[in-house]
């Protein structure tokens, strides 16, 4: 009801979604994304759960009751969710938390993050993973058997096609 009212009164409806919450599965998160799509937001944000110092989740993590996603698991889940939003023509305006003095690599002294899928280029990992999956799917579909493939693409997509640190090449 609140989402309808927000749109009715001319406000931009945006939703935020977290992946990797305690006991949440990939299927749970896909179903959450589908439920959000039905609410017709204009924009969404996708955040992976990070374990922050001195929080109830940190206590669960320290007691072995919560196991955070790895970066790879979070990227895998975010790729599928982003694809759902893209297919529904809903703009994903952020993926991953913005790097700050407190939200940074857990190895940094000032970081409040003690565990979880932190990566400063999380969105690029997701988008380049989506490009990689699509290109591999096309290569398989057309049964391409050569060792080298030339891909022509819009220059704005080149970084994601190549991948973070050239991981797709």
Indicate where each model-derived feature is located.
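Short glycine-rich, basic-tinged beta-strand/loop micro-motifs
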Residues: 142-160
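Active-site proximal loops enriched in glycine and acidic residues that flank catalytic Cys/His/Asp
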Residues: 48, 96, 153-155, 165
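C-terminal scaffold of the Radical SAM
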Residues: 2-147
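Short, glycine/charged-rich beta-strand-loop motifs at protein surfaces that mediate ligand recognition
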Residues: 121-127, 155-162
């Amino acid at each position: 009801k609140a989402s309808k009212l927000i749109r009715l009164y001319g406000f931009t409806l945006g939703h935020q979604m977290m992946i990797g919450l305690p006991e949440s599965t990939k299927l749970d998160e896909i179903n959450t994304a589908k439920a959000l799509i039905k609410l017709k937001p204009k924009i969404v944000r996708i955040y992976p759960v990070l374990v922050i110092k001195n929080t109830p989740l940190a206590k669960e993590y320290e007691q072995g009751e919560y196991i955070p996603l790895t970066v790879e698991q979070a990227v895998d889940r975010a790729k599928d969710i982003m694809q759902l939003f893209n297919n529904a023509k809903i703009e994903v305006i952020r993926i991953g938390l913005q790097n700050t003095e407190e939200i940074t690599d857990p190895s940094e002294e000032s970081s409040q993050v003690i565990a979880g899928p932190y990566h400063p280029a999380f969105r690029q990992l997701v988008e380049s993973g989506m490009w990689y999956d699509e290109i591999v799917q096309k290569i398989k579909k057309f049964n391409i058997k050569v060792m080298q493939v030339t891909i022509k693409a819009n220059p704005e997509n080149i970084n994601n096609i190549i991948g973070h640190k050239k991981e797709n090449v």
